[in-house]
């Protein structure tokens, strides 16, 4: 007899307590990362077509969302079974996340020798520079690790996007990102609440595509002024 799938198992335990700790994207398909109260590890549940009906158990403490570790191999999720004490994470995971984020986003200013070795190895890998637009018309410039872009744009929730440069590593790509941001006043982040709200009052696709095309043209003009080695233009 076949074992029940994770979603069937969750559905059968209607009185159980579950912690939704994140979403994992693989091959452009989303899965929910779920912890079952008392279980030793995380279960991945396919999200496409999943119907969720739940009650919030106010008597139970929140659960830490875990953290992301980065190394030469890429990014990996580290689960944590501790209660959340600082926002959505436990104190230890939050401190590690804060240090990791500071090292990653300030690496090009701090220098390779001034950040954690594992982060330096993570960044010593080809990256891409992209321009993205979201459903409400919000725009940003961003970076993603890997020669093919990976799952980053899907994770970000971009409605449309263009890759504008292939860069030799994560240090140089962030220098280019900063140049673009300062030159045309283009932000590097969009609030998650705006991303969600945009699906309720989204702009027409034709409007978004036109805005992105015009913005990409401006970004490309900025990049053409950068006479340095280590990157090439993209139009993808």
Regions found by a protein language model. Give the residues of each.
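Non-catalytic accessory segments flanking enzymatic or RNA/DNA-binding domains
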Residues: 1-236
């Amino acid at each position: 007899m076949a074992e029940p799938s994770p979603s069937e198992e969750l559905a059968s335990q209607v009185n159980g307590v579950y912690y939704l700790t994140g979403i994992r994207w693989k091959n452009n398909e989303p899965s929910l990362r779920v912890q079952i109260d008392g279980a030793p590890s995380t279960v991945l549940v396919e999200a496409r077509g999943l119907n969720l009906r739940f009650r919030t158990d106010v008597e139970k403490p929140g659960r830490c969302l875990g953290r992301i570790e980065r190394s030469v191999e890429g990014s990996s999720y580290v689960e944590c079974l501790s209660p959340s004490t600082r926002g959505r994470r436990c104190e230890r995971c939050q401190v590690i996340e804060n240090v990791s984020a500071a090292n990653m986003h300030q690496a090009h200013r701090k220098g390779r020798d001034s950040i954690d070795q594992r982060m330096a190895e993570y960044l010593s890998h080809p990256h891409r520079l992209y321009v993205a637009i979201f459903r409400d018309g919000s725009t940003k410039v961003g970076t993603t690790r890997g020669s093919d872009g990976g799952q980053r744009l899907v994770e970000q929730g971009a409605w449309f996007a263009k890759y504008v440069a292939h860069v030799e590593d994560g240090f140089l790509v962030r220098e280019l990102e900063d140049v673009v941001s300062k030159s045309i006043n283009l932000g590097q982040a969009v609030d998650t609440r705006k991303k969600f709200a945009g699906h309720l009052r989204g702009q027409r696709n034709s409007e978004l595509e036109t805005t992105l095309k015009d913005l990409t043209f401006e970004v490309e003009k900025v990049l053409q002024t950068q006479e340095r080695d280590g990157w090439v233009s993209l139009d993808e």
